[in-house]
């Protein structure tokens, strides 16, 4: 999505001159380092779940889906840097067919990262809701078969949507669709939270008898959601300003922070695995076994 994720350089020169805010430029080495760390961390999460049979349950499969989304966001930046490096060294023809195709694939990965995160957080929220309020029926409602079907549908939809958004990236309806998914996810989870709160008040005694792990999972989701909003909201706002007021000096002033907003997205992929590890004793044990080379049961 070139005009959506291409930075502030596309802004009108007159608007830049009318703005007193200089571009904030960060070294590419910072992006590359954070991206590498994000890929490695999320890869470790995936390997831990794959190698440990005790973690192969719906909840951790949904977490793996979020880890894949984070990893795609980091891979996007790594591949973009590699592409720029090859172009600057003269190995690629500027604006050539290969570069255009590679740009589209990389942009699709970026969109997949956002869409995958949105839907992964949504299904994690639904899973936490069922765990808390339908604990006795949980294993009959959230089966492995339904989990795999749900995740397959989500990623097929995200892939198709990502390709469509890249193809029609220069149309305003595409931008609106791209940005509207973010608040829609927030509304969905907020409604779920309100419903959970109302049910918790009316079933306080029942909720107090639930295993602590169930409530701990809800708190983990809240932390993940808060980090996601903090890291992605500035970029979503950038996209909206880029579309609807690209020449306004105040908008241009905010858009001069594009690289900081981009770094926040990269940081999201680094922070999430720490949240999993800190909140999940099972995952911590899996990490310890991986690094100490113990065999899994």
From Swiss-Prot:
Alphabetized GO MF terms: corticotropin receptor activity
Biological process annotations from GO: adenylate cyclase-activating G protein-coupled receptor signaling pathway
Stored Pfam families: 7tm_1 (PF00001)
Assigned keywords, A-Z: Cell membrane, Disulfide bond, G-protein coupled receptor, Glycoprotein, Lipoprotein, Membrane, Palmitate, Receptor, Transducer, Transmembrane, Transmembrane helix, Ubl conjugation
Glycosylation sites: 12, 17
Superkingdom of this protein's organism: Eukaryota
Lipidation sites (S-palmitoyl cysteine): 293
Disulfide bonds: 21-253, 245-251
Membrane topology qualifier: Multi-pass membrane protein
Annotated compartments: Cell membrane
Topology feature Extracellular, residues: 1-23, 80-104, 169-180, 245-256
Any single Gene Ontology cellular-component annotation: plasma membrane
PTM annotation: Ubiquitinated by MGRN1 that may be involved in post-endocytic trafficking and/or degradation of internalized receptor.
UniProt subunit comment: Homodimer. Interacts with corticotropin (ACTH). Interacts with MRAP; this interaction targets MC2R to the plasma membrane. Interacts with MRAP2; competing with MRAP for binding to MC2R and impairing the binding of corticotropin (ACTH).
PANTHER family: G-PROTEIN COUPLED RECEPTOR (PTHR22750)
Protein name as annotated: Adrenocorticotropic hormone receptor
Organism: Mesocricetus auratus (Golden hamster)
Classification of source organism: Eukaryota, Metazoa, Chordata, Craniata, Vertebrata
